Amino acid sequence: MPEIRTFLCRSDNIGVLLHDPVTSACAAIDVPEAGAVLRALKETGWRLTDILVTHRHFDHVEGIPEVKARTGARVTAPAKAGDAVPEVDATVREGDVVKVGSLVGTVWETPGHCADHVTYWFERERLAFAGDTLFTLGCGRVMESPPEVLWRSLSRFLALPDETAIYSGHDYVLSNARFALAADPDNSNLKARAELAERVKRDGRFLIPTTLGEEKATNPFLRAGEPALARSVDMAPGSDPAAVFAALREWKNRF
């Protein structure tokens, strides 16, 4: 099984290192901050071979030039990001395969937060590196498309096994929990997770990874097809989940 190290970057970005103990290959999922990634590499003793970019936003790619210069890592980025990602060696599209040593992942194009966003899905290991598409108890802002586009991207996750570990690009768990409780106040599983989030944050940690099963039970954006979430945005049970999602996302923007 792979080894994974998560750590804080900038103020609320989450850095991730994915290490294959069989081959000693190691990938960083985005590089929000060069110093934080380099410190994590020093602490683990891992040698960085790859950088897998989820999307072009500055807070996910700022550290790439320095880290590549220090490590020689190969940079793989979404083709649709164009030249917005620095130092790119290879580009990927829907269905392409990425390898980190013996670990084999598939590229999903998951637009909605931005048009070039991708998720890296490692089926054998049940790992999804979701960037800013799916968060613990939340989802990314819709920035470049109608909300239905992000809903379609999120819907792909619903087909994955419940035990899938989801690694996201930011730690917004407390604000996400507050909104989730407002939207789904009678959800006992959500109440328990919100309490856990408070405890974890007090300890200086974060709820990453989450699992798909936990998110299906507690994340209002993945639960847009549930009657309780339709009612929370003054829609009838059975309403189009994409429309419910759009209303939830707009509410969260103002929350």
UniProtKB/Swiss-Prot annotation:
- Which EC numbers does the record give? 3.1.2.6
Q: Which CDD domains does the entry link to?
A: hydroxyacylglutathione_hydrolase_MBL-fold (cd07723)
Cofactor, free-text remark: Binds 2 Zn(2+) ions per subunit.
Q: In which pathway does it act?
A: Secondary metabolite metabolism; methylglyoxal degradation; (R)-lactate from methylglyoxal: step 2/2
Q: Name one Pfam family in it.
A: Lactamase_B
Q: Which residues bind Zn(2+) 1?
A: H55, H57, H113, D132
Q: Which domain of life is it from?
A: Bacteria
Q: Name one GO molecular function term.
A: hydroxyacylglutathione hydrolase activity
Q: Name one GO biological process term.
A: methylglyoxal catabolic process to D-lactate via S-lactoyl-glutathione
Complexes and interactors: Monomer.
The name under which this protein is listed is Hydroxyacylglutathione hydrolase
Gene name, per UniProt, is: gloB
